[in-house]
Amino acid sequence: MARYLVLAVALLLAACSSTQKKPLADDPFYAPVYPEAPPTKIAATGSIYQDSQASSLYSDIRAHKVGDIITIVLKESTQAKKSAGNQIKKGSDMSLDPIFAGGSNISVGGVPIDLRYKDSMNTKRESDADQSNSLDGSISANVMQVLNNGSLVIRGEKWISINNGDEFIRVTGLVRSQDIKPDNTIDSTRMANARIQYSGTGTFADAQKVGWLSQFFMSDWWPF
């Protein structure tokens, strides 16, 4: 019996344990892509000026090729509210009048046969859920790929070390070149297939985690 109890406890601990890996600051998935350096051309006239390295005061500075940097303005705000309720009523009423036979009531042991039964049930349940989140800030990302239609696949991360922990923001998504503003910024609400992650690691982040025993009581494994 003790052997089965130890096995059951081990299974519960294994189920409650978290296998999620901690994020790393040098994740290769978010590594920047650098544009290839153009071949150096020697001017035939001996002049220092070269057309390949020239830029105009009126040129477009918006990101449009692999390796360019674009600033994403985070303007995320979500709010969800849900309420549900149900009420179930059920009742039954049954009666059996005394049975007459031969001009008198039929009785058992001198007690007339008479039955009265009444039952009722009323169940009412209500639930409310309200959740809201907001995220403001900015992060610069790298253009990882340019699609055939001109859309840009962008990806980037920002790590900030504060006291005993690190905070990070990771962004990946798809943007249209037309939605990029003249100052080379774009709102996060204009990103398609956006993945925005804001979290942290260290002492403060660990303090916000729920312990394994509390996770068990709040999980589907708890029978009550």
UniProtKB/Swiss-Prot annotation:
Q: Where is the lipid attached (S-diacylglycerol cysteine)?
A: 16
Coiled-coil positions are none
Q: Name one GO biological process term.
A: bacterial-type flagellum-dependent cell motility
> Which molecular-function annotations from GO does this UniProt entry contain?
cytoskeletal motor activity
The record's similarity note reads: Belongs to the FlgH family.
Query: What is the annotated quaternary arrangement, including any partners?
Result: The basal body constitutes a major portion of the flagellar organelle and consists of four rings (L,P,S, and M) mounted on a central rod.
Task: Kindly provide the name given to this protein in its UniProt entry.
Answer: Flagellar L-ring protein
* GN (gene name): flgH
